[in-house]
Amino acid sequence: IFYFEEKPLSQILEEKLHIKIYIENDTRSMAYGEYLQGVVKGEKNILFINISWGLGIGIIIDGKVYFGKSGFSGEFGHFSFFENEILCHCGKKGCLETGASGSALYRTLLERYKEGSNTILASKIDAGEYIGLSDLIDAIHKEDMLSIEILEEIGFNLGKGIAGLMNIF
């Protein structure tokens, strides 16, 4: 039987380990790491973009991580961006993440293949094997048109989203 106290996990760990504990999301942690030791070392204001299965931003203002009013700053992938019917994992439709992320790239590849597009990744798709970004890049180097088209489309959408961020930061 599990017993869960109504305490933050960081507080429970601090009591057990006797050290200060901070629990943070991946993107804000990466942004802070770049601020401390990365290519932006010495800058006071940073906008860090994490492009992965989803999209997120870490914001550093005057040398401090920005959390936002409710602690959920940086949900870049959930900007209302498209007029599509693709349901985002957040429950909304039209999020930038539905057309400009790793998950969008993968979903689009599978959809277009099932619709009849040819790709050198067909055997991996048919076998249910994992297809990563490196597989897509290899396919592009081998001039796989479907992979090229999808990366161009995702890149275009992502570029438009990033351009919008640059205008507000």
Outline where the language-model segments fall.
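Short active-site-adjacent structural elements
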Residues: 32, 56-58, 166
